[in-house]
Amino acid sequence: MVNESLNQEESNDRPVPESEFQADTSYSTQPSVSIHPSVSGHPSVSIHPSVSGHPSVSIDPSVSVHPSSSAHPSTLAQPSGLTHPNELVKEDSVIKVSKRRWAVVLVFSCYSLCNAFQWIQYGSINNIFMNFYGVSAFAIDWLSMCYMLTYIPLLLPVAWMLEKFGLRTIAITGSALNCLGAWVKLGSLEPHLFPVTMVGQVICSVAQVFILGMPSRIASVWFGANEVSTACSMAVFGNQLGIAIGFLVPPVLVPNIKDQEKLAYHISIMFYIIGGVATLLFILVIIVFKEKPKYPPSRAQSLSYALATTDASYLSSIVRLFKNLNFVLLVITYGLNAGAFYALSTLLNRMVIMHFPGQEVNAGRIGLTIVIAGMFGAMISGIWLDKSKTYKETTLVVYIMTLVGMVVYTFTLNLNHLWIVFITADSLGFFMTGYLPLGFEFAVELTYPESEGVSSGLLNVSAQVFGIIFTISQGQIIDNYGSVPGNIFLCVFLALGSALTAFIKSDLRRQRANKDAPETKVQEEEEEEEESNTSKVPTVLSEAHL
């Protein structure tokens, strides 16, 4: 390609679609053609000095332009990065998916797993840390709730950073903070050092802000139109698996013993393991993460490149989102469901120990059952959405079944049969945890082409707010009245969420963007392949696509 810097005074010339340029047969395709005898140039192409256009114009070296051509000068090339949206969805647009996308979503899932483990590692053995640090149950609850509290004020700055600096910067920052927080906790292995473990947990909670809004963004930027829901489910899958491991591993690594020195030793093993894993994942993020693939993976993503502008008002995007009634309803309903899950996860150990004293390990296994079942629910619902596109219907059914599962769990917990609790926890988790990625994807559909980082961030703020309210309220109800009234409290709000979900309209804007454009075969990108075919005019891509 030959890049010519042309006169700026004609920079406002209308950019003509590449199809016009290729169709004009008055342009010679013979190499080494001189355009005007008085003008000399590159051996393979000469350009008359009167031809002007936008800066950084890409011109195929095999094309020469005769001054007598009747075409407008701006048809000679497509300005770099200044393509109209309707031109981006023409038939010859390059739409490819990158093989790297699987590595990106896998690494993200792993460090999201690590961060989620650190969130629940205290709550899953609440009574053991109470005895070790000599603090109240409410103080240990704050090791969980600090994740929720930190997210609320930091959402908008981090979402702005995601738009400003992109996926790679946010991923590196989140994994670095996650690693730092894990190592800080190693300085809290004495009973009087509870403030140090709180500082480490707060650092990890800040890392979470750089993680929770990423799944839908990664899915949209890296995956094709028929993969986005599955990819989003895979990204959320890591966070859920981290919670599952956080329920299972701490009760095994840290037994309920009275000897403080031995207890400190067991806690240190857990902290060292998580510190080493967090460090390894930080290195992998640096190696694997790229800002975006070489080519857009879908027409909707290609169009979003065109609509994105550097001077776009970030606050105006948020204002537009809150004017979208369907999205506002989803924010509320998502917060109610996810907030109930956060409260249930935080207080699960306390509820199980109340009915089954000395069963810390089984309390962790019940939590594991809830999350593992939810992971299967998330994957199944993600695959179903990619096939059926029934976002509203699927979300509503899953929400109602979450309510049913919570009611059954509530009234079987006090039957004093542990195997029944495992069964009801499994059914509850399948729908309650499986709902989380549905909310992300439904939000992107309702708000397209607004930023996925902003929409998913607002969903998470709602989840954190309701999570704090529900955790504190249910904790007080359990302490004063028992587990059944505490769980009924959550059932009431899940019923409200189910009713509100029914009023959300199925306005699938991203699906319309993909369907409105002509079909293009999505190819698998061969990243190592060099573009060696210069015998024909290639599709011109703006620099934003590379």
From Swiss-Prot:
The sequence repeats are found at 31-36, 37-42, 43-48, 49-54, 55-60, 61-66, 67-72, 73-78, 79-84
Q: Where would you say this protein principally sits, based on its record?
A: membrane
Q: Which UniProt keywords apply?
A: Cell membrane, Endoplasmic reticulum, Membrane, Mitochondrion, Phosphoprotein, Repeat, Transmembrane, Transmembrane helix, Transport
Region described as 9 X 6 AA tandem repeats of P-S-[VS]-S-[VIAG]-[HD]: spans on this chain: 31-84
* Keyword Endoplasmic reticulum listed: yes
In this entry, the parts of the chain located on the Cytoplasmic side of the membrane are: 1-93, 165-166, 223-227, 289-324, 389-390, 447-454, 506-546
Q: Which InterPro entries match?
A: FLVCR1-2_SLC49-like, MFS, MFS_dom, MFS_trans_sf
- Any ranges marked Extracellular in the topology annotation, and which? 119-136, 187-193, 254-258, 356-359, 414-416, 481-482
**Any one of the GO CC terms:** membrane
Q: Where is the composition biased (Low complexity)?
A: 54-74
Keyword Iron-sulfur applies: no
Location in the cell reads: Cell membrane; Mitochondrion membrane; Endoplasmic reticulum membrane
Mode of membrane association: Multi-pass membrane protein
- Reactions catalysed according to its record: choline(out) = choline(in); ethanolamine(in) = ethanolamine(out); heme b(in) = heme b(out)
Q: Which Gene3D superfamilies match?
A: MFS general substrate transporter like domains
Please indicate which superkingdom the organism of origin belongs to. Answer: Eukaryota
Question: Can you quote the domain comment?
Answer: The N-terminus contains histidine-proline motifs involved in heme binding. Can bind 2 to 3 heme molecules.
Q: Quaternary state and partners of this protein?
A: Interacts with components of electron transfer chain complexes III, IV and V including CYC1, NDUFA4, COX4I1, ATP5PD and ATP5F1C; these interactions occur in the absence of heme and are disrupted upon heme binding. Interacts with ATP2A2; this interaction occurs in the absence of heme and promotes ATP2A2 proteasomal degradation; the complex is dissociated upon heme binding. Interacts with HMOX1; this interaction is potentiated in the presence of heme.
What function does this protein fulfil? Choline uniporter that specifically mediates choline uptake at the blood-brain-barrier. Responsible for the majority of choline uptake across the blood-brain-barrier from the circulation into the brain. Choline, a nutrient critical for brain development, is a precursor of phosphatidylcholine, as well as betaine. Also mediates transport of ethanolamine. Choline and ethanolamine transport is not coupled with proton transport and is exclusively driven by the choline gradient across the plasma membrane. However, the presence of an inwardly directed proton gradient enhances choline uptake.
Q: What is this protein called?
A: Choline/ethanolamine transporter FLVCR2
| Lineage, uppermost ranks | Eukaryota, Metazoa, Chordata, Craniata, Vertebrata
